[in-house]
Each structure stands twice: as structure tokens, then as C-alpha cells.
Swiss-Prot record:
The modification N5-methylglutamine is found at residue 252. Methylated by PrmC. Methylation increases the termination efficiency of RF2. InterPro entries: PCRF (IPR005139), Pep_chain_release_fac_I (IPR000352), Pep_chain_release_fac_I_sf (IPR045853), PrfB (IPR004374). Peptide chain release factor 2 directs the termination of translation in response to the peptide chain termination codons UGA and UAA. It comes from Pseudoalteromonas translucida (strain TAC 125). Its main location: cytoplasm. The gene is prfB. One of its GO terms (cellular component) is cytoplasm. GO terms for molecular function: translation release factor activity, codon specific. PROSITE patterns: RF_PROK_I (PS00745). The keyword Cytoplasm applies. HAMAP family: Rel_fac_2 (MF_00094). This is Peptide chain release factor 2. It is found in: Cytoplasm.
């Protein structure tokens, strides 16, 4: 005979957790908004504004992820309860096993939805930009910056984000001096926002004929893509716009026309670059979008600076903050904020970052 009470208790627990999430995630409001979005998308006129239609499509996906999951949890627990009753009545082990399996699937869906509570920031659902910049250390630091770029590109692709390399400036000998990546997808900024900071590499340098240990640094800065409706005070006279030939790793030119665009916001010395489009006009439009997003994030950080300094338990998230060390000779990668470690260094550098990111989100960084 099988143990029924543990399964009954699990069903009860899942129902209670689902009910808590229903309130926390504003299920009723999201359900109502989903109906409104569906109605808008059914109106053929919406496709006259492609950007608006795409934004509605993304909103629909985000709303469905909550509404449909909660609906599945509610009906799913009812179904499991029915299976359990059948199993007990018929004394059927196979039906009992099926009930347990379905319950495990429901619990996985519930845990994934519970994790969404970490994305409570006002811009967590936005697309995101990641700026990488090599620190001091010459070729070794530039190679490290390129390794980080590869790591984040692989992570983004594995998470199902659309990943765009907006700009990369080749290193003097190897690697890159810097790069900007755009991540498009649900909660891109929410996933990435705790990656802002300094990443430290310790290894025997392949560029040192003596095989000595070198320490290198690279900075990551993450900021959300902002809606066009958000007003950012940007005086055209404060902008310096330069055009240049796009170049790849190692300094080689990737095209022969001056289509790449660099925009500097002089008052804040904020610089953005774009070279992934063939057209100078498109690169300029993308660079302006990046600049708006970056200035928005800097403004948010400035507004929160006083609060951050008062919260002793939390790290300063400025450019000077070292968040993670990668000591390859000792096969150890450690997050200095959460204490999370991994000995599988190659796996992490191949993009398996969720262990670190989830820990930082759960700790409220």
C-alpha cells in the first residue's frame, strides 16, 4: 500500500503557496490587462505601429507567464487530487505514481514563478544593455574582457534571450578593450542587474613567456533599455558625435566606410558606441537609444546613492566594486558578495552563471 498523507500534504502546500502568489503577483489585475492586450492585438490597426505591436506582444508573453501558470497550478492540483482518489479507490500503484509525477511538475512550475518575485524592480522586465571595459593590465586585461564577453553571450543565448553585439573595440594584440551587448527578452535587466561591478582574473598569463601569475580586471555595467515615453533631459549641444570605421578584435577593420558612431554626453562624460549596423544612420539611432538608457540608469543610481551608503549590509554597486574573483590556477570562482563558489571554472566561463545570479538576487543585492 502506498503513502497517501504526504501527497495530500504536498497538494495542500502547493495550493497555499499558489494563493500567496496570486495576491503578490496581482493575478486579477494581470488577467484583466491580458484581456485588454489581446483585444488591442486583435485590432489590425495596431500593426500600423510595429514598435507598439511588438511591445504589446512582449507584454502579452509576460502576462501569460503569470496568469496561465497560476491557472495551471489551480487546475493541476485539482487533477492530482482526482488521480489520488482513483489510485486509492482502485489500489493502483501506476495511477499513484502518475499523481506524484504530476505533482512534482507542478512544484517546479511553482518554484519558477516564486523566483519571479525577485524581479520586483520597476525596470526588471525591460531589455538590457551590458557594457564591458577592460581594466589596467594591457593585453592580459583585454583578453580577460573578451573571455567575459564570450561568457555573457553564451549565458544569454542559453537563457533564450535575443543577444546582439552592439559594439566591440579590438585590443592592441588580442582580446577587446570594451564591448556593448544588448539582451532582448523577458526580465533581461532583472536577470543581469546584479552583474554590475568589477570582475577579477588571476591566472598564469599565456602572454607571459615566463608563465607568471597575473591579476587582471574588467568592469561590467548593466542598464535597462528605457521606453521612448520616458523623458531624459538631453541637450543636443551637450553631445559630441564622432564617426569612424568599425573594427573587430585585433584591430582589423570590419568595413571600409565610416559607419560606426560614437556619442559622448559631455556633462557626464558618458560614452556609447554602435557599429553593428551597416548604416551610419541606424548606428546613430541605436547609439542614441543606448545613451538615453545609460543616462537613465546613472540618474537612478544617483538618486539611490544616499540609500545605498546607509545600508551597510549591501555592497556599493559602483564601478569600483569588485563582485567576483576568477582564480583559474586554483580552479575557484567566488562571488565576494554572497560567498557562492564554483570549482568548475570552465563551466562558468562557458556561461553557466545562474548559480551566482540567483544567489545575488535572493540576497537582495
Amino acid at each position: 500500500m502506498f503513502e497517501v498523507n504526504p501527497v495530500i500534504n504536498q497538494i495542500k502546500e502547493i495550493r497555499e503557496r499558489t494563493e500567496l502568489l496570486r495576491g503578490y503577483l496581482d493575478y486579477a489585475l494581470k488577467q484583466e490587462r491580458l484581456e485588454e492586450v489581446n483585444a488591442e492585438l486583435e485590432d489590425s490597426a495596431v500593426w500600423n505601429e510595429p514598435e507598439r505591436a511588438q511591445a504589446l506582444g512582449r507584454e502579452k508573453s509576460a502576462l501569460e507567464a503569470v496568469v496561465e501558470t497560476i491557472d495551471t497550478l489551480v487546475t493541476g492540483t485539482d487533477d492530482v487530487e482526482g488521480l489520488l482518489e482513483l489510485a486509492v479507490e482502485a489500489e493502483d500503484q501506476e495511477t499513484f505514481d502518475e499523481a506524484q509525477s504530476e505533482l512534482a511538475d507542478l512544484n517546479e512550475q511553482l518554484e519558477a514563478l516564486e523566483f519571479r518575485r525577485m524581479f520586483s524592480g520597476p525596470h526588471d522586465s525591460n531589455d538590457a544593455y551590458l557594457d564591458l571595459q577592460s581594466g589596467s593590465g594591457g593585453t592580459e586585461a583585454q583578453d580577460w574582457c573578451n573571455i567575459l564577453l564570450r561568457m555573457y553571450l553564451r549565458w544569454g543565448e542559453a537563457k533564450g534571450f535575443k543577444v546582439e553585439l552592439v559594439e566591440a573595440t579590438g585590443g592592441d594584440v588580442a582580446g577587446i578593450k570594451g564591448a556593448t551587448v544588448r539582451f532582448v527578452g523577458e526580465y533581461a535587466y532583472g536577470w543581469l542587474r546584479t552583474e554590475t561591478g568589477v570582475h577579477r582574473l588571476v591566472r598564469k598569463s599565456p602572454f607571459d613567456s615566463s608563465g607568471r601569475r597575473h591579476t587582471s580586471f574588467a568592469s561590467a555595467f548593466v542598464y535597462p533599455e528605457v521606453d521612448d515615453n520616458i523623458e531624459i533631459d538631453m541637450n543636443p549641444s551637450d553631445l559630441r558625435i564622432d564617426v569612424y570605421r568599425a573594427s573587430g578584435a585585433g584591430g582589423q577593420h570590419v568595413n571600409t566606410t565610416e559607419s560606426a558612431v560614437r556619442i559622448t554626453h559631455v556633462p557626464t562624460n558618458t560614452v556609447v558606441q554602435c557599429q553593428n549596423e551597416r548604416s551610419q544612420h541606424k548606428n546613430k539611432a541605436q547609439a542614441m537609444k543606448q545613451l538615453k538608457a545609460k543616462l537613465f540608469e546613472l540618474e537612478l543610481q544617483q538618486q539611490n546613492a544616499e540609500k545605498q551608503t546607509q545600508e551597510d549590509s549591501k555592497s556599493d554597486i559602483g564601478w569600483g566594486s569588485q563582485i567576483r574573483s576568477y582564480v583559474l590556477d586554483d580552479a575557484r570562482i567566488k562571488d565576494l558578495r554572497t560567498g557562492v563558489e564554483s570549482r568548475n571554472t570552465q563551466s562558468v566561463l562557458d556561461g553557466n552563471l545562474d548559480k551566482f545570479i540567483e544567489a545575488s538576487l535572493k540576497s537582495g543585492l
